[in-house]
Amino acid sequence: MKKAKLIFKDNTPFSLDFDDFYFNSKDGLNESKFVYTHSFEWKNQENFIITESGFGIGLNFFLTLKRFLETTPSKRPKKLFYISVEAFYIEKEQLREIYQKLRFYEEFKELLEHFLKFYPKAKEGIYRFYFEDCFLDLVFEDITILKELDFKADVWYLDGFSPNKNSQMFDENLIFEVARLSKKNTQICTFSSASFLQKNLKKYGFRVEKTKGFRKREMIKAYLENELEFKDKEAYFSRTFSSLKNKKVAIIGAGISSAVLAYELSLRGFKIDVFEKHLELGKGASGNESGILSSLILKSKVKLGEFSELSFIEASRFYRQILDLNFKGVVEFAHNDLMQERFDTQRENVLFKISKNQAFLEEGGVIFPKNLVKNLFEKSKACIYFNHEFQAYKFENECFTLKFKNDIVKSDYAVLIYAMGADTKDFVFYDEMKLSKVRGQVTHLKPFLDTQFPLSSKAYICPIKDDLQVIGASYDRLDASLESKEEDDKQNIENIAEFIDKNTKLEIIGSKVGFRSYSSDRFMIVGNAYDEAFYKEEYKALLWTKDKEQKPAKMSCNLYFNFAHGSRGFSTSVLAARYLCALINNEPLCLEKKYIHAIHPARFLVRKLKKGL
């Protein structure tokens, strides 16, 4: 990612990249309020979306958030979504220094320090920050990333230096995307009154009004008169907006994917009931005593690897923001030539500090799955029903009725979510969706290696916890045994041989078996359940029509999937939960289209149809 070249000129931040000030050198605070943050009215609605082109030092965001929090809740939206795109990275310490030099620091100190605490490294991606009743999605990408995003903004801040020095931020391509991502009466706020900007806005349906700008300047405001119609060539992957009879949600399964989702849903005011077939938490794969938060390291520009990296960093930031966890890092080792090739292509990746055959992932570390899941459920205030083995559902009058073993029935749920991990294989039967149930066994040893970092190679070693040390894990697609096996413990020990002296005596004090859920392409399966018969009929000619407009997809109403997280559920569950909340609650989708397509439940069928099969 490009780093901003920034100096101070007239006591104001000045960009050497664009030969322009970040804002008015005389009275930047009041100009920002006048042009952007105080130039529109709040609407008393569920979600309010503001999108900004050019985050800069974040002044517009902090002013907006301050205004939002100071407004009486009954006179503002319930949730503020603020999406800001920035292509030039400013270092954390430099941001703090800028606020101090401008004498803004004390005014924004609390909000700014919270922001800086979770500020990411200089790497492209979408990074979420949690504030009171507000989500900030900071998008570190070029502005062309808008074509990959999906939301309907209420207000746009078109910022980003003078149009004659940064024309890309105001050109026709950008304004088309702005119009696509807007709804009727969406307001455009901008300091500019450039004629070519006015022309582009009018071309895509905005009503443009000239108005007096800050002090002597002239500026424009614009309003979308009618929502833009455009041809969707990939409608089979597009969202369908949800309509809910109530805010009751049922989640089947009580592992990590369920726990993160329950927490995220609780932030949106949903009442969550969780149904678990076991008698307590921690009986499945999410119940290990210790585990590792880490990322796959694949060759650069491999989509699965890029998604794993984003999932990992966002999970780390989520656990730090929500559970106040601290991570000391994890060390990954290249244990064969293929792994070494992968490491060699990632030497410039800021997530991986690579030296020879080692990679240090600073944002990773040891996790304690059992406690983590328990804490998230407690925060969500979800009601967990143990000893409830799910069997079937009915959907009538816009609500689900659930049937469980022993003739137990629960009803009146507007949303049903499958998050039962490896057990999903027994409930989902799409023709092209191939699911695997993979057995894994971890071994509990008497402490034998004093390490503050988890070590991961052929197998992994966790730091000591409560007089035991966890190593693992075995991997067997063909074994369905629930009992621990001596040969698996032996294999786990053999796989950590590179970390210990051959004369070290290891004492086994226990083992634990769990089952992972995998898809055939290793991406998780997250999103709406779909109408298979509709897809097969409507999209049967995709081989010949894939470059033409497609009819909107038909989904199974308010039934959602959240499974196939494999062995990295503690990473992938965070993005999965946010994405599902966005679908359920009609929020901005927090993922790029390429990743939405990669995790979509219908992707396997669509691939087959595109081949004419």
From Swiss-Prot:
Its cofactor is FAD. Residues 252-613 are annotated as: FAD-dependent cmnm(5)s(2)U34 oxidoreductase. SUPFAM superfamilies: FAD/NAD(P)-binding domain. Disulfide bonds: none annotated. One of its GO terms (cellular component) is cytoplasm. GO terms for biological process: methylation; tRNA processing. Residues 1-225 are annotated as: tRNA (mnm(5)s(2)U34)-methyltransferase. In the N-terminal section; belongs to the methyltransferase superfamily. tRNA (mnm(5)s(2)U34)-methyltransferase family. In the C-terminal section; belongs to the DAO family. Catalyzes the last two steps in the biosynthesis of 5-methylaminomethyl-2-thiouridine (mnm(5)s(2)U) at the wobble position (U34) in tRNA. Catalyzes the FAD-dependent demodification of cmnm(5)s(2)U34 to nm(5)s(2)U34, followed by the transfer of a methyl group from S-adenosyl-L-methionine to nm(5)s(2)U34, to form mnm(5)s(2)U34. This is tRNA 5-methylaminomethyl-2-thiouridine biosynthesis bifunctional protein MnmC. The gene is mnmC.
